[in-house]
């Protein structure tokens, strides 16, 4: 005889085989059956009023969608689809009130710190720095950077995400264009970039909030070559929101700045990330079409740095000397950087262009897990300091000037090393940033060849509400 909770959840008596397979899910079924849908409906309706304005349906339509989804399992035949619906219902039951429902409660009185930078102060330096990136010949065929198409739901979601960043600022950190907008309101921004400790349940609940309020179907994708990255798309593949998930310990360790009660990734770290990014060929070519946008972002970061550290020195100690190590059995994809100028506790950095090669090297060295520092998607690499050497991974292309590593890639590798110092709060970190400020402009020597970045492979994970599918 089937346990009563299984019969009640399915709305029918299951076969003995199905009963055995579902027995382990009795606790989740009980929680779903006991879920207060009237209270949930009131939270969804409040969310519609606060964030969706005129976009949402009537309360009657919302109630019908909620009732349909919480009884959907009764109309399904495939066990896999039933388990998918139960898993997603369980996420709503356990997480919605904490992640999204709480955003509808009155805002507590907060004296939020506001920080604005004098961006024009750094405009000339930013322009000279970016002009020195004109080092690539025009492509034979126009190949603009692949950009995702934005959904018409982005503007609605932005209002909600801003409130999420303020209310839950112990669980999420903002970076990118919106973080810079908080420092310089002249910065335009599209979607809002963030890392958080509960990215998957947050986006699942957001997907259901959109569905219950508007009837719009959305899909969540997990991209295999980006660490713990989840993106929410509309029914036509339009980009709504993405987020990186990080461990709580990682989030607590990140250097941040509190602006308008939102924690933003420290501008020094974001500046290093930007300099790393410009070792990438598609980013350099994109400057030709989006120079003003890039300059506005760089001058904002530079203005913050100049205010904190003083004027840039006339001659910085970076970019660090870099060269490829002699190959072992093939073309070398390992760089060595001379880090002595940073006076930071290690004399050199061994920089792998292939992450599996770094992992294998650490295994061969017998490294223990607690010796490795990893800031997940923020640094996009683990770090180890041993025997006066930093071991790490660089995920961008390396530009060459003849047989030598080009200044721009030396700067990118140097920025990666300085980012490590910043993330670990090393005493030499701020001095290293100041040195970078004094070496942002180079002579724009042409790039003669490119060492490609590592190509990562894998299959996308999908959560499709309409099709009742979860693939990992």
Swiss-Prot record:
GO terms assigned for molecular function: ATP binding; poly(A) RNA polymerase activity
Family membership noted in the UniProt record: Belongs to the poxviridae poly(A) polymerase catalytic subunit family.
Recorded name of the encoding gene: PAPL
CDD domains for the chain: polyA_pol_Pox (cd20919)
Catalytic activity from the UniProt record: RNA(n) + ATP = RNA(n)-3'-adenine ribonucleotide + diphosphate
Coiled coil region boundaries: none
InterPro entries: PolyA_pol_cat_Poxvir, PolyA_pol_cat_sf, PolyA_pol_nucTrfase_Poxvir, PolyA_pol_nucTrfase_sf_Poxvir, Poxvirus_polyA_pol_cat_C, Poxvirus_polyA_pol_cat_N, Poxvirus_polyA_pol_cat_N_sf
Subunit structure: Heterodimer of a large (catalytic) subunit and a small (regulatory) subunit.
GO biological process: mRNA processing
Active site: 191, 193
Annotated organism of origin: Orf virus (strain NZ2) (OV NZ-2)
Domain of life: Viruses
Keywords: ATP-binding, mRNA processing, Nucleotide-binding, Transcription, Transferase
Function: Polymerase that creates the 3'-poly(A) tail of mRNA's.
Protein name: Poly(A) polymerase catalytic subunit
Catalytic activity, EC: 2.7.7.19
């Amino acid at each position: 005889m089937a346990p009563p909770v299984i019969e009640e959840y399915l709305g029918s008596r299951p076969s003995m085989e199905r009963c055995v397979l579902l027995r382990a899910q009795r606790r989740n079924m009980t929680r779903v059956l006991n879920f207060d849908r009237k209270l949930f409906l009131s939270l969804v309706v409040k969310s519609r009023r606060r964030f969706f304005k005129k976009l949402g349906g009537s309360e009657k339509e919302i109630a019908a969608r909620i009732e349909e989804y919480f009884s959907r399992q009764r109309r399904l035949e495939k066990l896999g689809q039933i388990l998918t619906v139960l898993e997603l219902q369980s996420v709503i039951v356990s997480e919605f009130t904490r992640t999204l429902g709480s955003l509808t409660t009155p805002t507590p009185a907060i004296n939020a710190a506001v920080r604005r930078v004098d961006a024009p102060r750094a405009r000339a330096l930013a322009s000279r720095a970016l002009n020195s990136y004109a080092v690539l010949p025009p492509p034979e065929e126009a190949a603009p950077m692949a950009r995702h198409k934005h959904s018409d739901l982005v503007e609605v979601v932005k209002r909600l995400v801003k409130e999420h960043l303020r209310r839950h600022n112990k669980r999420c950190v903002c970076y990118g264009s919106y973080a810079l907008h908080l420092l310089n309101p002249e910065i335009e921004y599209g979607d809002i970039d963030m890392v958080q400790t509960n990215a998957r349940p947050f986006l699942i609940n957001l997907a259901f909030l959109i569905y219950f309020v508007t009837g719009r179907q959305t899909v969540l994708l997990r991209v295999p070559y980006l660490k713990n990255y989840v993106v929410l798309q509309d029914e036509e593949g339009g980009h709504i929101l993405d987020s990186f998930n990080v461990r709580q310990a990682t989030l607590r360790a990140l250097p941040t700045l509190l602006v308008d009660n939102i924690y933003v990734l420290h501008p020094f770290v974001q500046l290093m990330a930007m300099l790393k990014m410009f070792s990438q060929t598609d980013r350099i070519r994109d400057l030709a079409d989006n120079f003003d946008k890039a300059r506005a972002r760089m001058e904002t970061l530079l203005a913050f740095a100049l205010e904190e550290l003083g004027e840039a020195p006339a001659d910085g100690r970076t970019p660090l000397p870099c060269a490829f190590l002699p190959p072992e059995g093939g073309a070398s994809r390992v760089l060595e950087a001379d880090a002595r100028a940073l006076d930071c506790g290690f004399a050199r950095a061994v920089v792998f262009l292939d992450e599996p090669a770094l992992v294998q090297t650490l295994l061969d060295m017998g490294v223990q897990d607690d010796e490795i520092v990893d800031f997940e998607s923020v640094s996009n690499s683990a770090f180890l300091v041993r025997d006066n050497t930093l071991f790490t991974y660089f995920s961008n292309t390396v530009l060459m000037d003849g047989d030598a590593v080009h200044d721009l890639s030396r700067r990118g590798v140097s920025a990666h090393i300085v980012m490590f110092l910043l993330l670990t709060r090393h005493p030499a970190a701020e001095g290293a940033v100041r040195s970078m400020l004094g070496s942002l402009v180079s002579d724009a020597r042409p790039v003669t060849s490119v060492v490609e970045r590592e190509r990562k492979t894998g299959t996308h994970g999908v959560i499709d509400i309409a099709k009742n599918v979860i693939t990992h």
